[in-house]
Swiss-Prot record:
One Gene Ontology molecular-function label: deoxyribose-phosphate aldolase activity
Family as reported in the entry's similarity comment: Belongs to the DeoC/FbaB aldolase family. DeoC type 2 subfamily.
Gene3D superfamilies in the cross-refs: Aldolase class I (3.20.20.70)
The organism's taxonomic lineage, starting at the top: Bacteria, Pseudomonadati, Pseudomonadota, Gammaproteobacteria, Alteromonadales
Keyword set includes Lyase: yes
Biological role: Catalyzes a reversible aldol reaction between acetaldehyde and D-glyceraldehyde 3-phosphate to generate 2-deoxy-D-ribose 5-phosphate.
GO cellular component, as recorded: cytoplasm
HAMAP family per record: DeoC_type2 (MF_00592)
Protein name, entry field: Deoxyribose-phosphate aldolase
Keyword Ribosomal protein tagged: no
Amino acid sequence: MSDLKKAAQQAISLMDLTTLNDDDTDQKVIELCHKAKTPAGDTAAICIYPRFIPIARKTLNEIGGDDIKIATVTNFPHGNDDIAIAVLETRAAVAYGADEVDVVFPYRALMEGNETVGFELVKACKEACGEDTILKVIIESGVLADPALIRKASELSIDAGADFIKTSTGKVAVNATLEAAEIMMTVISEKNPKVGFKPAGGVKDAAAAAEFLGVAARLLGDDWATPATFRFGASSLLTNLLHTLELADAPQGAQGY
């Protein structure tokens, strides 16, 4: 198997297959669940809005997808600085049955010089998750832009108890970049290599996935990237990876997240 095919195979096993669109429906989420069981193996998770968790759980149970995790989003997508609302949303997501919660860090507050609210919001949301629900923190690196701010948001999130740090919501102009990945995984290597990393949005094909996995291997070791420590947040990426593995036709037309 070529290096590119190996990267494609690995990336599928690390994928949070995502639909976070305003026009999402039960039927679209059911279809997403079926897509997550790919000819090359299951994706690590699906990522959906909280209201679709019950239908996703039912569908995954029916199709033998019990091992596919259900991730959802809170404080999404704007990263507001109201801790109480973020906590209520996170508690509700856990009550709905989310295995993982991707919460948006109050990145605008950090850009205005407020480091405290981000730390406290992540800490409170981690407490709301309890012991069994994974918390991923979206720092919106494409808006932070400044390497010092990307580093600071990563440090604050890890210090507050994040299980993963994630680049992006996929709802802004600049999403996952190798530059942000380098900074964020450097912080992970310095602080706690058990914390995971999730590039989201903009990873379009096996070659791009391989580049992100290469940064992970260089900074954290060849065997570091597993579903417990690395995820790709993506939608269109899956079809491209299956095409690389010669298990699907080339994608047609416009592609999303």
